[in-house]
């Protein structure tokens, strides 16, 4: 029997609030309602999924279009739409590969799979050069945990509360969101320990600013790793996708603590890798190379699911065992899609675009602090941005205003998500132009103004 009071959703907007019901009543037509009802009858219900918001029939470039004909700029996209939806080059490459070689069964390799592994070794930082492919980021996290256990002879992990690393059993265990590890899931993976994350506003360590928070968090990680001394890995996103930007020196301190205690450092770049933060990999901002780097989401170009764990060669110690023997591990179509996606990102200068347009966007968002007292923090890098809303006097999260802003924006053609209930989180495709960004922020500014005055 499940508890009646479910945990507050932190991964995205809720699907059971009065605001969602009101939006559906006013914005869902008869045709869409029929499809939503069929969806509700066919799928298991779960938070932030079924029951769904609406139904879409088209996705192209930075836009999605619902069954009723409303078009949205998609600044959510589950972080898969780096090159925009339906990129012509990607669709052509997939079609060609399906004609040439649609599948590679177990025991066989193929040219696209090897090329992708070599490409990832070439573009990832440091000497990361040994790869395993999976069909999703959660599975790639599982592979990373297994490799870390095998290489160190240890089983314990350390990670952040409030982090998301996937919905699989091991990934949910190292994650820190109640939605994915709460009461109905039962006992999770043994040895998965957590510390409070760094922050800036309402820091769990009591820091007055981002630097103080980061310093306190780094000391706590150092303390736990040293005190127990037997962790296989510390697992984290190099920039928390809420988002929170690590203060200068934070990851160098963590890297030093890991090295001193024999703990492997695993960076989860599933949402941030391949240019999202204005660098090919988010960890490059901080000059720290992990022992294992995990990729997913945008790697398949927003069409096909593929993820990867990229490791130091010294971690290739389990040749007699199976760490990631997946049916589609070396699928020629998904690996060809990933190769083409990376090539498009490089050819079209999309990493540089995210850095340039993202910086302009962050400067504009920062100016909102002067207009909106509820905007207490603006943070991000490149095309990963967060606007935190809270009461000006009591600093309590302004969740109602955030939710109203979300639905106001949807009504006017902008889709994004809220995280932790009060952070407006924008993750645009890397192909977003300055003009498109300006249009999206115009919609968001109007939506926020209306929400706070409601």
Model-found features: residue ranges?
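Conserved N-terminal phosphate-binding loop of PLP-dependent enzymes in the Aspartate aminotransferase
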Residues: 2-454
